[in-house]
């Protein structure tokens, strides 16, 4: 689904990438879960849905999946097909690049993702040639090994990252969050790591609230707060984007 072709000045654009077995439509409510502030008052949201594919760690069951996962608990070595990840990244880039071509400032583009979607989100940001507004990873992991570092451009390294993880999560252990932040900081990136001791593998309102405040903070630092405009959010339900031609 192509973004709207309005010629009005483009507002901030947020891509939300869902977790394994979920859909974009089921996450639409998140656009209204962020408080109406300068950061998200007029944000345009996209909720793509992953293609349906067999997932090895779920005994080959067909479900929406950005790429195959071989093992659970999930770690970076649970992903064994790099090309599978890169195909997903290219589709995220296509969505972002269409928005930029339509007039959205790259620094007004944010990529958020939960679990497998968080893994795809951080991979997409690291491989994008431009500095984007930011990336928030909720209980995610790195879907690659350390050799991936040579592919990250100098511009991508300037994109700020928030990584939120639960100490009580067992599907994607807290070690994956710590290892991810260590990798990003090794690249010289600006990262924040927020751990909630009692949080399992789920998404809670207080995480969204923390993310919103993080976005406001980085916008303030960059002088891009803008005016608070109480207008309706535009939501793009990009269903099965990755299966479209």
Curated annotation (Swiss-Prot):
GO terms for biological process: regulation of plant-type hypersensitive response. The active site is at 115 (charge relay system), 201 (charge relay system). GO terms for molecular function: carboxylic ester hydrolase activity; palmitoyl-(protein) hydrolase activity. It comes from the Eukaryota. One of its GO terms (cellular component) is cytoplasm. Pfam families: Abhydrolase_2. InterPro entries: AB_hydrolase_fold (IPR029058), LYPA1-2/EST-like (IPR050565), PLipase/COase/thioEstase (IPR003140). Belongs to the AB hydrolase superfamily. AB hydrolase 2 family. This is Probable inactive carboxylesterase Os04g0669700.
């Amino acid at each position: 689904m192509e973004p709207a072709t309005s010629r009005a000045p483009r507002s901030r654009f947020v891509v939300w990438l869902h977790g394994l077995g979920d859909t974009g439509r089921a996450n639409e409510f998140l656009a209204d879960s962020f408080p109406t502030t300068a950061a998200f008052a007029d944000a345009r949201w996209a909720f793509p849905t992953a293609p349906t594919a067999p997932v090895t760690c779920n005994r080959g069951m067909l479900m929406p999946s950005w790429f195959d996962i071989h093992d659970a608990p999930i770690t970076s070595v649970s992903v064994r097909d790099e090309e599978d990840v890169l195909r997903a990244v290219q589709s995220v880039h296509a969505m972002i690049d269409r928005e930029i071509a339509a007039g959205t400032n790259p620094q007004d583009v944010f990529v958020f993702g939960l679990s497998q979607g968080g893994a795809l989100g951080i991979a997409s940001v690291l491989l994008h040639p431009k500095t984007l507004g930011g990336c928030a990873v909720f209980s995610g992991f790195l879907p690659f090994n350390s050799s991936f570092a040579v592919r990250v451009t100098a511009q991508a390294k300037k994109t700020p990252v928030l990584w939120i993880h639960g100490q009580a999560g067992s599907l994607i252990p807290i070690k994956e969050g710590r290892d991810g932040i260590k990798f990003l900081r090794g690249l010289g990136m600006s990262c924040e790591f927020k751990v909630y001791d009692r949080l399992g593998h789920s998404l809670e309102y207080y995480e969204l609230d923390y993310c919103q405040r993080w976005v406001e903070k980085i916008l303030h630092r960059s002088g891009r707060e803008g005016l608070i405009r109480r207008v309706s959010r535009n939501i793009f339900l990009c269903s099965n984007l990755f299966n479209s031609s």
